[in-house]
């Protein structure tokens, strides 16, 4: 979505809410409580963006008690034609809520104007359409949300397929509510998947967390995968900055086979 102009009608609708800059703590609390929250809308992500030379701001929408009810982390970077603002998997607001979206859009516009940004682009972390494993739609798409953004001056950039250059638009989610144990969960997968899990168990595969000095291993594995799956890998420096920004909240995992342990267990 790209943001353009607002109208007098929108300004009147936003009068019930106030916009102010949130502290890092306020924003993290908002993100944690919001159904639209995620790691890309956190203070840690702001630290990561700042390490790349970007300016960041926590734009918050507060109620009459000054309590945050919606907001967005905006990262401003120098583009080819001027400063550009990005809301990664944001804003933290229901796109179908006309009043809150109107007020928040006004606040985002003002934040962009203060840094002379030429555009704002957002990737809302809100479901547009739920599909089954075969790709069949299970409900009507949320076109009302798209129309609401457009009413506020945002322009829809269209849908994409496959790996996106900036943001993943497709998410596969496994509903675990119907399973009471690991055995039932495993049984729900296809035969080939169950066989691969069994092979991994019998082969002594171990999963562990890498420390910072081992991130080159993670990078090299991603590089091999990117060549096979045709997506762009990140640099080792990027992974190190993610590690530094998120601390214990970021886990870089690796699966290993320790042949000596495997052979010893097989002999026993």
Feature names for model-found ranges:
Residues 1-18:
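Short, low-complexity, intrinsically disordered N-terminal peptides in bacterial proteins
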């Amino acid at each position: 979505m790209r943001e353009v102009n607002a109208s007098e009608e929108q300004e009147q609708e936003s009068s019930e809410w106030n916009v102010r800059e949130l502290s890092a703590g306020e924003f993290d609390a908002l993100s944690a409580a919001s159904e639209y929250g995620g790691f890309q809308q956190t203070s840690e992500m702001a630290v990561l963006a700042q390490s790349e030379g970007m300016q960041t701001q926590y734009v918050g929408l507060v109620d009459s008690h000054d309590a945050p009810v919606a907001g967005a982390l905006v990262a401003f970077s120098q583009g080819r034609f001027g400063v550009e603002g990005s809301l990664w998997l944001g804003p933290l607001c229901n796109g179908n809520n006309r009043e809150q979206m109107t007020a928040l859009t006004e606040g985002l516009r003002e934040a962009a104007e203060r840094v002379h940004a030429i555009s704002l682009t957002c990737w809302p972390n809100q479901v547009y359409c739920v599909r089954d494993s075969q790709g069949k739609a299970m409900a009507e798409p949320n076109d009302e949300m798209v129309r609401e953004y457009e009413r506020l001056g945002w322009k829809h950039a269209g849908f994409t397929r496959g790996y996106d250059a900036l943001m993943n638009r497709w998410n596969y989610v496994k509903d675990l509510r119907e399973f009471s144990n690991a055995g039932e969960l495993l049984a729900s997968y296809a035969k080939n998947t169950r066989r691969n899990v069994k092979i991994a168990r019998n082969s002594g595969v171990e999963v562990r967390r890498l420390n910072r000095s081992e991130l080159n291993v993670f990078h090299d594995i991603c590089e091999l995968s990117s060549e096979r799956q045709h997506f762009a890998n990140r640099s080792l420096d990027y992974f190190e900055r993610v590690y530094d920004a998120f601390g214990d909240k970021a886990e870089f995992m690796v699966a290993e086979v320790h042949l000596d342990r495997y052979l010893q267990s097989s002999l026993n």
